[in-house]
Amino acid sequence: MDDWENNDFIQRLDFSSCGEEGEDRSINEEDTLSSSPIKHCDFQKWNSPLPATPHRKLSEIFLSRTKSWVSPTLKSSPGVSRTHGNAETPLHITWKKLQLCDTPHTPKSLLSKTAFPSPGAKVPPKGFRHLRFTPGADLDDSTQASLVNINPFTPESYRQMLFLPNGKRKAREIKLVHLAQSFCEKAEVQRKDSAVRPADRCPLKDSNMVSRYQKEFLELERIGVGEFGSVYKCIKRLDGCVYAIKRSKRPLAGSSDEQLALREVYAHAVLGHHPHVVRYYSAWAEDDHMIIQNEHCNGGSLQDVLLENAKRGQYFPEAKLKEILLQVSMGLKYIHNSGLVHLDIKPSNIFICHKLVVEGQAGQEESDSDDEFSSGVMYKIGDLGHVTSIANPQVEEGDRRFLANEILQEQYFHLPKADIFALALTIALAAGAGPLPHNGAMWHHIRKGNIPSIPQKLPNGFIELLKLMIHPDPMERPSATALTKHPILRPSLGKAVQLQKQLNVEKCKTAMLERELKAARLAQTLMKDQPLGNANLQESETSPKKNNKRLVGGKNCRSFSFTVG
């Protein structure tokens, strides 16, 4: 143990630095690990949370690993407590005294110095340096595919593109083919099932890690409460931006609400980013609770504004109602064109964002903006927990107050028109209509195409549009695309179409005038050249005719002919 006494400075083996260093190197290192299971097992035992190895054996294992790392010329560090005396001192105590075990207070420069040996030291093989603790590293392809959720809203053609090999390595191509087969087989089984079985998807369970929510976010206040859970206004510590963090009330793993939570994540991931849909950033699970990181809308929900208006006896004016209807229709158009349907449109699921314009740049912001909304307010669709596919619907009924009758009758042939129905009732509430009934005679009266009583005077054209949106026959209701082009909501668009028609007529007139002018100029040119042509004609008539015959040989005439064409 003399070497141990003289070299009591133990250089830390930085296994956390085994980052990805390139595709080819990672593949070679994984092959090295799979071909040397003894080293891999020793390393896992040394870091295992199971009861510790006896001290003498542990010291022997450690010395065998670090003998080639420690330089005999290294001096003891003053910051490390020296260990004298009994050689049976547990190694893990000395290890902890180094204070370099990935503590958040250790400078990165110090970690980098202790993570590499001295220039004269012997470098260990790369395979040992890049050992990983991945428990599923030895799983076969089918097992790995079973641990991946299948997004039911992803188009099949796009899902197949995910596993197209790039042709760089045959081993990678073969692995991708096996994964694609397992993945597609699982997707087909899930598509045929009416409900996804808990055993067929990745459960909502954490991995005993430090709370990501507490580590990455600073909670400011609770801004909303719903059936699913609570929404908190938080600042992300890394970028300093404000986000809305949605956390489920109850543990969802294995419960009936788990599918709703996953459906919202699936829909957000597929829809991507649209100015009239609340933006999605991330989602994860902690203690079996689903946590979703979304865009924070600084104006709250439309329901919050309606409650404030009710207290003050106010309601949205006509121009504002048209703007809300138009913007939400744009969001629905994007959702419907993506092959999905929302099925829970109501004031509490429409969120408001006030644009923040820097002073002195208002004119530039207006000129660079692509939209035509001058109020600086954006209305966005959120809460995608009831979203389902139009082609393969798995319908969960939303709020009965906004539910179309065909959904209650389980007639899912025109699902997008159910969103149009709910949007019309949402606009009626914003216009000042009273609370909607959950059932009863008034509920059926509305389903017959009757708009609830609105206290303010609105144009007949706008009222007729709302009535058309709640027509008993869903085929008679306008689509979201038609609403975005409706002349009542976008009169400027109709005016632009009219001006375009007038422009086309004027272009035709201009083209005709140009042709007439060209013909007139051509005729004038011919008139100028006509006297010269007549003089040449008269001269040819008065002049004697020339003999055009050709004499060949003995002054004999030779005739010739030619073909025109």
From Swiss-Prot:
**Annotated positions binding Mg(2+):** 349, 383
Q: Which part of the chain is the Protein kinase domain? A: 217-493
Do the record's keywords include Coiled coil?
yes
Q: Which Pfam family, any one of them, does this sequence belong to? A: Pkinase
Sorted alphabetically, the Gene Ontology BP terms of this entry are: meiotic cell cycle; mitotic cell cycle; regulation of meiosis I
Instruction: Identify which residues the record assigns to the active site.
Output: 344
- Locations listed in the record: Nucleus
Write out the coiled-coil annotation as residue ranges. Answer: 496-522
Q: Where is the signal peptide?
A: none
Q: According to the UniProt record, what class of enzyme is this?
A: transferase
User: Which residue ranges are recorded for the region named Disordered?
Assistant: 531-553
Protein residues bound to ATP: 223-231, 246
- What are its E.C. numbers? 2.7.10.2
Q: What family name appears in the similarity comment?
A: Belongs to the protein kinase superfamily. Ser/Thr protein kinase family. WEE1 subfamily.
State the name under which the record lists this protein.
Wee1-like protein kinase 2
